[in-house]
UniProtKB/Swiss-Prot annotation:
Name this protein carries in UniProt: DNA gyrase subunit A
Record domain Topo IIA-type catalytic: where: 31-495
InterPro entries tied to this protein: GyrA, GyrA/parC_rep, Gyrase/topoIV_suA_C, Topo_IIA-like_dom_sf, Topo_IIA_A/C_ab, Topo_IIA_A_a_sf, Topo_IIA_dom_A, Type_II_DNA_Topoisomerases
Source species of the chain: Thermotoga maritima (strain ATCC 43589 / DSM 3109 / JCM 10099 / NBRC 100826 / MSB8)
Alphabetically ordered keywords of this record: ATP-binding, Cytoplasm, DNA-binding, Isomerase, Nucleotide-binding, Topoisomerase
This protein's encoding gene: gyrA
Major localisation: cytoplasm
Other remarks in the entry: Few gyrases are as efficient as E.coli at forming negative supercoils. Not all organisms have 2 type II topoisomerases; in organisms with a single type II topoisomerase this enzyme also has to decatenate newly replicated chromosomes.
Biological processes annotated in GO: DNA topological change; DNA-templated DNA replication
Length: 804
């Protein structure tokens, strides 16, 4: 074989060859034709099945037979892509309106593969037959197949708006298409409206087409964005699975009955199982797939008291239960060019195609009716002169002379004469002649009708509307996908499963949050467990037990207040030290935390106590502008003084108890402390003895129920009835609260309790013990208490009370 040399720069050849290859993939493989909504392989499969006679009411044939027919005659590629395309057109979870009826295993929504083609069988659906109707009437151009031995349709006549109702997807070279499916009934209504109102806008068409209608149902949640998507032909559609909650005797069940289009059910279950395993804060107990022939049903069991909305939001955010359909309405137009069209453009192109198909069908029928009418007219002439015809035939030497004689005698054409000679004698009975006359009249009427179609555009439009209404009547069904507007952006709080956490801050500024259930409840007098892995020269300085959905107020030595959402703290294990406070709060170099207060969304005022005995009450709304990045002034600090405690109060009927390290305590009404601005210094709460200082303040609700819990640094503690602390005037010396601080050590904290709480005690070396408050005995006011924790050389630094 002689060599062929091309004298051309290789880069030029690469550009041209790759461009040809790209266009071949775009036009001949991956992008659908706007007229029938099919890619070449799909069109060839449907036409091949039509040629095999595989109609909806005929027996099915082996898929291998169909694939072989298509490959051998029209599609000279591998059998796998042909079979894959055939399978997809038969899957009810892939096609909104399947074009092939499959028999056997054609895969599943779990993405199980179909059976081999030698095992499965198929035939066309009725809807697919509607797409092929009239193809034999010269309604579309027929082109050569790959080897020029056969003809195949360039496009199908397609009475059905397949591209719109079934959508399409494909990846070509440098471009891709992704068109969502829609409801046939809605599409028909929109097409009819567009026929009557050619200037209609996309917004007007959307009165009928509400949005995509996926075969798997689900819910489109960004309805307000659909107008832009349909106007531009591109955009994002957000789809969520359909979920409801069922109440059981011991558990609640989150039930998923529909999933987003294109999502694997098995894959979704795996995703849910993974986050249930990896994220212990999500209380998912069990996941079951109860799907059957009646429909999909994925059951997620959660505790009776769990917040199902938070769990569902997490599933939307972290799994394919919420998915995105990225619309790109790229199609091949009738000039074989790739074009991005909007919704109206797709509909106009389809209507233009149907207009041309109906005209071509009318032209074909006009020719057929005219030819037949011409022949029947000749037969009627012969019937009226039957004697002459018989004489001519009997006296003619051969067929040719008989034809010539008939043409001359009856003044008919050669075609008519041939039909007369081919006519059987039985056609000359009076009944047959009457039938010919009726046929001729019918043909004249039909010719008039098709001529009107050829001459009047309005007649074509009328036919289109009738055909569309027929489709709606035969194949229309209710919408499956709900279209609505829902909140699709979550704030972080909507994803947080509420739980109690222990927030600790060390002397060196290491802040951490640990689930309270990490610390098992122990007996009073135990050794405790590690709360934080700190260095030898560091110690736990503050501890707060709160909900992870609430906030914590941090007050600094400069009198500034910062607010941090508790869920912003990374939840860690017990044996970690956490992250430095500066990673969360924008503190100045000389600024350090001196008090913490839990903000649970309730409360009216913040009470701040200082070491020197000052107390101040400020409305919480004064701190609304405080964030983790920007603090606000909370109190004016006098030189040598510092903040020791802060609490939230709800009512002026409550009372405050202020305690000192040397065992004194004073109780007075909240109303004794008037509200002040953030820049005020406060008023005197208690008159201190030399060397004494305030260590704690707490709030006592109205009434005389409950006890005052006192804990000292050497591990002693006691509960004393509230009524033993009589209400006094603010500013006095108070009452003796502990009998012998030399033995018990200085007082660390004083808290109001009811007896049904738990106490969390943290030592300077980072040990923690948690046990019920009820294990601490109720004794008198001037006593030393009982031993709460074995400390050794350690001492207690902070105390927190866990309330139900």
């Amino acid at each position: 074989m002689p060599e062929i040399l091309i004298n051309k720069p290789v880069e030029d050849e690469l550009v041209e060859s790759y461009l040809l290859y790209s266009m071949s993939v775009i036009v001949g493989r991956a992008i659908p034709d706007v007229r029938d909504g099919l890619k070449p392989v799909q069109r060839r499969i449907l036409y091949g099945m039509y040629e095999l006679g595989l109609k909806h009411n005929s027996p099915t044939k082996k898929s291998a037979r169909i694939v072989g027919e298509v490959m051998g005659k029209y599609h000279p590629h591998g059998d796998a892509p042909v079979y894959d395309a055939l399978v997809r057109m038969a899957q009810p979870f892939t096609m909104r309106y399947p074009l092939i009826e499959g028999q056997g295993n054609f895969g599943s929504i779990d993405r199980d593969p179909p059976a081999a083609m030698r095992y499965t069988e198929a035939r066309l659906t009725r809807l697919a037959e509607e797409m092929l109707e009239d193809i034999e009437k010269n309604t579309v151009n027929m082109i050569d197949n790959f080897d020029g031995t056969l003809k195949e349709p360039e496009v199908l006549p397609s009475k059905v708006p397949n591209l719109i109702i079934n959508g399409a997807s494909g990846i070509a070279v440098g471009m891709a298409t992704n068109i969502p499916p829609h409801n046939l009934s809605e599409t028909v209504d929109a097409l009819i409206y567009l026929i009557d109102h050619p200037e209609a806008t996309v917004e007007e068409l959307m009165q009928f087409i509400k949005g995509p209608d996926f075969p798997t149902g689900a819910v489109v949640v960004n309805a307000s964005e659909l107008k832009k998507v349909y106007e531009e032909g591109r955009g994002r559609i957000i789809v969520r699975g359909k979920v409801h909650v069922e109440d059981g005797k011991r558990v609640k069940r989150i039930v998923i009955t529909e999933i987003p289009y294109g999502v694997s059910k098995a894959g979704l279950i795996e995703q849910i199982a993974k986050i249930a395993k990896d994220d212990e804060s999500l209380p998912i107990r069990n996941i079951r797939d109860e799907s059957d022939k009646r429909g999909m049903r994925i059951v997620i069991e959660i505790p009776k008291d769990a917040n199902e909305e938070v769990i569902i939001n997490n599933l939307y955010k972290r799994t394919a239960l919420q998915d995105y359909f990225n619309v790109q309405m790229l199609v091949i137009d009738k000039h074989k060019r790739p074009r991005l069209m909007n919704l109206k453009g797709l509909m106009e192109a389809f209507l233009e195609h149907r207009f041309e198909v109906i005209r071509r069908r009318a032209r074909y029928e006009y020719e057929q009716y005219t030819r037949r009418a011409h022949v029947v007219e000749g037969l009627l002439k012969a019937a009226r002169a039957i004697g002459v015809v018989v004489d001519i035939v009997r006296n003619s030497k051969d067929v040719e002379s008989a034809r010539q004689s008939l043409m001359e005698t009856l003044e008919i054409t050669e075609e008519q004469a041939k039909a007369i000679l081919d006519m059987r004698l039985s056609r000359l009975t009076s009944l047959e002649i009457e039938n010919l006359q009726n046929e001729y009249s019918d043909l004249v009427r039909k010719i008039s009708e098709v001529k009107e179609i050829l001459e009047k555009d309005e007649k074509v439009k009328e036919i289109m509307k009738k055909e569309f209404l027929y489709l709606k009547q035969q194949y229309g069904d209710p919408r499956r996908t709900e279209v609505t507007d829902q909140s699709i952006e979550y704030n972080e709080e909507e994803l947080i499963v509420e739980e109690d956490v222990v927030i600790t801050l060390s002397h060196k500024g290491y802040l951490k949050s640990t689930p309270l259930n990490s610390y098992r409840s122990q007996k009073r007098g135990g050794k405790g467990i590690t709360v934080s892995k700190l260095s030898e020269d560091d110690e736990v300085e503050f501890v707060v037990v709160a909900k992870n959905t609430s906030s914590t107020l941090f007050i600094t030595n400069l009198g500034r207040a910062y607010v941090l959402k508790n869920y912003q703290l990374e939840t860690t294990g017990r044996n970690t030290r956490g992250r430095h406070i500066t990673a969360f709060l924008n503190l100045e170099d000389t600024e350090k935390i001196v008090a913490l207060a839990s903000l649970n969304g309730e409360g009216r005022d913040l009470v701040i106590a200082t070491k020197s005995g000052k107390i101040k009450r400020t409305a919480l709304k004064e701190f609304e502008n405080a964030t983790s990045n920007r603090g606000v002034r909370a109190i004016k600090i006098e030189p040598g003084d510092e903040i020791v405690s802060a609490r939230v109060v709800n009512s002026e009927k409550e009372t405050l108890i202020v305690a000192t390290k040397m065992g004194m305590a004073i109780r007075f009404p909240v109303s004794d402390v008037r509200r002040m601005g953030r820049n005020a210094a406060g008023v005197q709460a208690i008159k201190l003895q030399p060397g004494d200082e305030v260590v704690s303040v707490d709030v006592i609700p109205p009434g005389e129920e409950g006890e005052i819990l006192t804990v000292t640094e050497k591990g002693f503690g006691k509960r004393t009835p509230v009524q033993l602390y009589r209400i006094q005037r603010r500013g006095g010396t108070g009452l003796r609260n502990i009998s012998d601080v030399n033995k018990t050590g200085y007082v660390v904290a004083v808290r109001y309790v009811r007896g049904d709480e738990e106490i969390v005690v943290v030592t300077r070396n980072g040990m923690m013990i948690r046990f019920p408050v009820s294990e601490i005995g109720v004794i008198g006011r001037v006593t030393k208490g009982v031993k709460l924790i074995e400390l050794g050389d350690d001492t207690i630094s902070k105390v927190a009370v866990v309330k139900d």
